[in-house]
């Protein structure tokens, strides 16, 4: 009897150790609110990327090595359907984990992952907008022609070395689609990028970041499947009483023959000012083109009230301007809603 109890205790210890070495986590966020103009409004998530859940896992393989995976699904709060960056539930409707789906290995030398994921420039630039890129007040530069997400990607991330971190990625030329390439500015008020994706270059990208204390600076490069190239420079500094963020992106659009069609430059500056449980946000973004009647700009202002660490109320206003701010594209937009993270 004592031997049986001892055996059970030993097995239990091994089982506990094994379970402690691996884990699977469910996380995500839900956003619902009203978005519109003075003439029209609709119910939905202003920050569409906040209506998503992630299944992630990690297993300790010993010797400082671990295996991990991420599966990320986005949905529409108003009807429960799948959602993509276009907001159209019909796009990529057969792609369950449209946002991210990859597996990888990590060690002291960094990590390498394979699957579908954000490319380095788009992975970096979202962190330098005070509005987190998605609300109507957002002054995010958007990545110009940079690949947003790529299928069949191999992605390397180095460990942090003295505050510096390098990332690089390459994807297969086949199997990419137009919806994975950026190409609009200020929600229809700016640049429109032609979708000449039939020359099938391999999407590639790299980034270099320095982060230490209040400082965060980075550079990123991207070439999409049409051969369009984008350079991005980013920076932020946390002064304590407020945080200042900036972005600058430059891109050249080439046709199949390699002749330059358009050169675009876009920059933004924004700030986050915490006042107790309230966070004030404000920013300005502007872009220029070497072609006539293509300039655009936008001013955004908003606020977020933290009910807890995971739940907040928000409201924002975005006012586009410039050459392309005509018709509905020039309407001032607003949103008001609630976000809960889990």
Where are the model-predicted features located?
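Outer-membrane beta-barrel proteins
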Residues: 1-342
